[in-house]
């Protein structure tokens, strides 16, 4: 009978006390079959479930990051407003959705404007009323300026639905009333020809911007100078024409305005299309529609002045 206080003999097959080593030690195989043994706690070969740790997950791909120059973009930095960087614009789906949304809004705006111009031009009582009551034009101009400044300068209303749609609708109707009032002062033939010329110019510029490799967005300084020149010329022309009408000066200003806003249309179109030095954030679809629509309407008004057939 063994002493209870003595350590258990090797013959006791207690799992906590392995048996004595065989004579000569353990043999080492030349090649370990099946690779290295599993570390304690990890699943042993042949078992379908882990012993203590979960199975390792498959590797995940990193999300696209907004890298600066020198990180995969050949050192060229694309300036994008807010938090949207080149990574987001590399996604064709995001860009195409943005472009479709912008041009859908522009199409609705142009349809409303053409309808107002048609009413003010072809319906004689309406045409006579707006020619006699110039206050309609000035009220529309005030609404146009206020809504344009809010949409262009205030990010909150521009991005918050439904305020952005409400402001854009007010802006569109104000611009339509202004354009309709101007159109009522010209012959119907001149209005139709100006519409056709504007449509041809706008479509041609859009197709050109889709195809060309010329980056108009890199010439921001040039467009600022053009805008200042057009503004100063407009002020001088208004002062001169207020005292005495000078036909050639009026035509010169109209031609300069048509050329400048055609270039502005190319610039704003490339801002919307993306993949240029400067782009518009995908959240600012209202801004894209606002700019392109304004360019098209101003091209129409300047071309209409060049036609010169007043009532």
Swiss-Prot record:
GO cellular component terms attached to this protein's record: endoplasmic reticulum; endosome membrane; extracellular exosome; Golgi apparatus; Golgi membrane; intracellular membrane-bounded organelle; lysosomal membrane; membrane
Record bears the keyword Transmembrane: yes
Biased composition (Pro residues): 53-62
Membrane-protein topology: Multi-pass membrane protein
Keywords on record: Endosome, Lysosome, Membrane, Phosphoprotein, Transmembrane, Transmembrane helix
Phosphoserine: modified positions: 81, 83
One Pfam entry name: Bax1-I
GO MF entry, a single one: death receptor binding
Entry similarity comment: Belongs to the BI1 family. LFG subfamily.
Role noted for this protein: Negatively regulates aortic matrix metalloproteinase-9 (MMP9) production and may play a protective role in vascular remodeling.
Designated name of the protein: Protein lifeguard 3
Organism classification: Eukaryota, Metazoa, Chordata, Craniata, Vertebrata
């Amino acid at each position: 009978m063994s002493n209870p206080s003595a350590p258990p003999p090797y013959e006791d097959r207690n799992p906590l006390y392995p048996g004595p080593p065989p004579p000569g030690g353990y043999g080492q195989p030349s090649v370990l079959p099946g690779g290295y043994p599993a570390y304690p706690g990890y699943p042993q070969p042949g078992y379908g479930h882990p012993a203590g740790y979960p199975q390792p997950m498959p590797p995940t791909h990193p999300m696209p990051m907004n890298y600066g120059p020198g990180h995969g973009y050949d050192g060229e930095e694309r300036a994008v407003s807010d938090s949207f960087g080149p990574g987001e614009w590399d996604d064709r789906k995001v860009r195409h959705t943005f472009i479709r949304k912008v041009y859908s809004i522009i199409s609705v705006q142009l349809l409303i404007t053409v309808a107002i111009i048609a009413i003010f031009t072809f319906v004689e009582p309406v045409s006579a009323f707006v020619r006699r009551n110039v206050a309609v034009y000035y009220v529309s101009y005030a609404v146009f300026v206020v809504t344009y400044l809010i949409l262009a300068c205030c990010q909150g209303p521009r991005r918050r639905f439904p305020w952005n749609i409400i402001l854009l609708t007010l802006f569109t109707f104000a611009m339509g009333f202004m354009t309709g009032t101007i159109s009522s002062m010209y012959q119907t033939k001149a209005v139709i020809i100006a519409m056709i010329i504007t449509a041809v110019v706008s479509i041609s510029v859009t197709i050109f911007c889709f195809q060309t490799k010329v980056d108009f967005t890199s010439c921001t300084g040039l467009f600022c100078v053009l805008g200042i020149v057009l503004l100063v010329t407009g002020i001088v022309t208004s002062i001169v024409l207020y005292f005495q009408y000078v036909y050639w000066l009026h035509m010169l200003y109209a031609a300069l305005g048509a050329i400048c806003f055609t270039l502005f249309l190319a610039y704003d179109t490339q801002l919307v299309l993306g993949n240029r030095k400067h782009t518009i954030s995908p959240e600012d679809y209202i801004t894209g529609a606002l700019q392109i629509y304004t360019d098209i309407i101003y091209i129409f008004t300047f071309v209409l002045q060049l036609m010169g057939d007043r009532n």
